[in-house]
Amino acid sequence: IDKYFSPFISPNQKKICRTREKKDILPENNAGLYLVPQIMTNQAEMFLQTVEYLQQFGYNEVNLNLGCPAATVVSRKKGSGFLTEPKKLESFLKEIYEGTNVKISIKTRIGYESAEEFPILLSIFNQFPINELIVHPRTREDFYQNTPDMQAFSYAMDHSKNVLCYNGDIFSKEDYNHLMAQYPSLSSVMLGRGILQNPAVIASIKGEKLPEKETIQEFVTELCERYQSELYGERPVLFKMKELWHYLIQSFDADEKIAKKIKKAQKISEYEITVKELFSNYDLKI
């Protein structure tokens, strides 16, 4: 992996960065990684203040999130909700690109309700020196359902004045190869859910040794232990681990019964017994 993106920072008038968000971007917590902090706001002043704050940690590249589809986000016209106001978005981009020399990449969807919105959005993006335009070819209304709109992505490839990165539904080496066969000039691909669902996907793409079941078990165990040291109480830890297993379970030749047992676990001890059962009784299918 050449580049990582942090969970988004959502600045407000009271605080630029919450304690949890600060932990995400502290250099000592990201040793050896090229990390790009992600910012989500519709206020140019807040964006620039956050950039200035991040510079003190040595960051010279940030990312603007225009892709998040969560209802609590879009109701505030942030994330993909900002795509509904192209004129305000254009003014916002003008102000932030004039206000800093830090490299700014953008992650966007192709519209809020329809891909028909995308040509206007792309014409706005083309006015600015975007370090990297990461396109997830779904609308906000799609969330993560339906299939990526490759016609819209082809339009981006043909008309974007900025370097493009593709994001969406790369779950296997076959998915990656199919994408690159369609777009041989594409310079980069971003993985999100794909690497959670298939931890071997990058090794597979690069032709490297695939992770063994024991390696994944060690990772899952350590992750749970770290959550327990960082979070208060069992419920938030279980929430985080169940969120991961929603995707990771698909890497195993497991039945619905064991998946439900993980989902229904009410205590960490119960969760750990079930996960141990999974690793003992089911093989990887990646």
What residue spans do the PLM features occupy?
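Flavin-dependent oxidoreductase catalytic cores
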Residues: 1-286
